[in-house]
């Protein structure tokens, strides 16, 4: 189902529930994988592991970046990477560039996901808002919504680097 862009969270939830109900009427067993359910902890844990792998690859290459910039929607990737880096005592800082939400909303989501993952992994390391940065300066018309400014940026990137990027990036 295609839904209108720029829906608020409540409208998205209603749409998800409508699709779930339609599928249930067809005899299927659909589930909405909400970011606060077990799925969220599993996704976050995967990125805790990814932090260790990333640090290994960086060590092998001899590179020591001070920041790791990533896109952040629900915050699970940022939570896992930041938790993993902190647990492994890496000075690298996660810079979570928000795709849709504002920092005051996304920051506690990242903390929540990290806390659940740490609990499941039985880590004593805990993440706080001091351990990562949420950048919400680039949230515009919506995640992946093509605007004239975005189209211009895509053309500029294509000319400069010889490749076309997806509007999400």
What are the residue ranges of the model-derived segments?
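PLP-dependent amino-acid enzyme catalytic core
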Residues: 1-169
